[in-house]
């Protein structure tokens, strides 16, 4: 079982989310990857969201903010250079959301920041949300991706 890590050097939201989806579609069932990336200014919307209802598209165009749709549900989020994004992608036999969340929590705690899991998908530090997470499955491959305010 190969465990892989990939850090994108691109800050293009379209490229990074396309890579995220490509990894989901092309990973072998016996593999697991942690993919990390940072996007320059972008609004990332969930798969079922209407961009005309969620975004001020004129202001986004004027401010050169990308609009990117992700493959998971959930609400719109703003990405910029202060936001680290991660994606755990694994065959269903290796996929363990609790273990993946604990990996993130333990890493944040190693930085001296007390944090906890809350609700369905959120991570909190001192009662404030610093990470939202979403999930999907295609065939025998599962994905858990999220954001971290840095």
State each model region's role.
Residues 42, 60, 69-71, 128, ...:
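Short glycine- and Lys/Arg-enriched binding-loop motifs that mark or flank ligand-binding interfaces
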Residues 34-37, 77, 115-117:
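Short beta-strand
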Residues 81, 85-150:
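Catalytic beta-strand/loop module used to bind and position nucleotide/cofactor moieties
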Residues 43-46, 51-55, 75-80:
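Short active-site-adjacent helix-start/loop capping segments
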Residues 39, 45, 55-61, 83-85:
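ATP-binding N-lobe of GHMP and related small-molecule kinases
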Residues 62-84:
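A glycine-rich, hydrophobic loop/mini-helix early in the fold
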Residues 49-69:
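Short, His- and charge-rich active-site/binding loops that engage polyanionic ligands
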Residues 1-51, 135:
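Active-site loop/lid in soluble adenylation, ligation, and acyl-transfer enzymes
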